[in-house]
């Protein structure tokens, strides 16, 4: 079954809101073995909406709309659809009663314009809205299916799961099941080179790379009768990829870097403290995103000035004068100092030039040093990052945490 998602709303075209509905629906349809071939966005205009319906029904078996079900004159999704399909809409008493009950529940008066939300063709399958006023509907016509859903994500998701998914299951022949591997420390082009033959030759499962926020993901997708059968197809391909990429694969699914690192620290009862200059607390912030990290995270210090570095974490004045605040020597003393001062097993530090100003020929914008002290073993890493100030700072944090993860694994800590 080929599906198309048609999002309705001028606010989407203007960029006032993000179309998260399409992402959600696409993923859930994939779980049901239904492939989304196209996604479209159209404004609140009857003529253009009709053109969108005409195109969608030409190329898809299932058309799912979101938005445009409100009580105002520019909410046209249903009206144009019914006209296009040659359907006459009549007041659906049960839907009207539910809308009236909704307004009573929130203690607000219902206006006459809300009645149009309860109008549907007699052969429509009504999808009740338990979180708002606008019901949806399913219409079968000429071996095509139209499913009309509300725009607010909270209402759309509930209606999709409660009403549309049970309806669509009767068409389900296969499931599409995916597993995502998350990769750090290797660029997208290098990942593609390492697994090139897998990308080229795999048909079921397929493997597709994506790059975002300093990391690369590989999505392995299999089609089978059941999720269990799909997982069996995915398993050998996943293992081959892991064997080739090694430590670069840090997690799968929606697991974050801070979750991986936080679990390692907590499971092994290893304490940590941070000393930050250019990242200004972002490093500590990423760590404390993980629930339960308080059992091992001792302290986060922002030692931005030289005075703070000397006073709070015992960086030597001679080191700062000889090598400067942005240096491997300073990063090393920051990491070692914060570990000693806080009594932590690990100290991790950042110092650099995030920009846009402050760079020199010898020390350009984007030069960052990261220091790690693990139970007295001190190492530093020099980074050369590109982008604006915020990007340099964010990438520093990711690179620092990823390096710490690898160092812990190399020491036998998992």
Swiss-Prot record:
SMART domains for this protein: MoCF_biosynth
InterPro entries: CinA (IPR050101), CinA-like_C (IPR036653), CinA_C (IPR008136), CinA_KH (IPR041424), Competence-induced_CinA (IPR008135), MoaB/Mog-like_dom_sf (IPR036425), MoaB/Mog_dom (IPR001453)
Pfam families assigned to the protein according to its UniProt record, in alphabetical order: CinA, CinA_KH, MoCF_biosynth
Family stated for the protein in its record: Belongs to the CinA family.
Name of the protein this chain belongs to: Putative competence-damage inducible protein
Organism: Clostridium novyi (strain NT)
Taxonomic path: Bacteria, Bacillati, Bacillota, Clostridia, Eubacteriales
